[in-house]
């Protein structure tokens, strides 16, 4: 396994570990999720460049679109929770139910 793939896998693993450790705050969970998305984007881009396939060139762009949608929804939820309750705890998400 080349060193670049090992570094990207390590970055994904560290972000996943951070997501599991710091899951009580929404902001830290969103940052760890963005780190995971960034490492997946780099991995998909490198795999696409190595395969030289024209049909696979859309995969990194699709990954970026999903990451942007996830970030927008997460930040909107964070703003809603912090404006309402003043805290960014994940267990406040249960309070948003109707």
From Swiss-Prot:
Keywords: Electron transport, Membrane, Mitochondrion, Mitochondrion inner membrane, NAD, Respiratory chain, Translocase, Transmembrane, Transmembrane helix, Transport, Ubiquinone. Signal peptide: none annotated. It catalyses: a ubiquinone + NADH + 5 H(+)(in) = a ubiquinol + NAD(+) + 4 H(+)(out). The keyword S-adenosyl-L-methionine does not apply. GO terms for molecular function: NADH dehydrogenase (ubiquinone) activity. GO terms for cellular component: mitochondrial inner membrane; respiratory chain complex I. Its main location: mitochondrion. It is found in: Mitochondrion inner membrane. The chain crosses the membrane at residues 1-21, 29-49, 58-78. GO terms for biological process: ATP synthesis coupled electron transport. This is NADH-ubiquinone oxidoreductase chain 4L. It comes from Pongo abelii.
């Amino acid at each position: 396994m080349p060193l670049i793939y090992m570094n990207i896998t390590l970055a994904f693993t560290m972000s996943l570990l951070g997501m599991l450790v710091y899951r009580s705050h929404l902001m830290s969970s969103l940052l760890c999720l963005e780190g995971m998305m960034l490492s997946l984007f780099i991995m998909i881009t490198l795999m696409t460049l190595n395969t030289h396939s024209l049909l696979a060139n859309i995969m990194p762009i699709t990954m970026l679109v999903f990451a942007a949608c996830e970030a927008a929804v997460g930040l909107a939820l964070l703003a809603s929770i912090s404006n309402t309750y003043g805290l960014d705890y994940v267990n406040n998400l249960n309070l948003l139910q109707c």
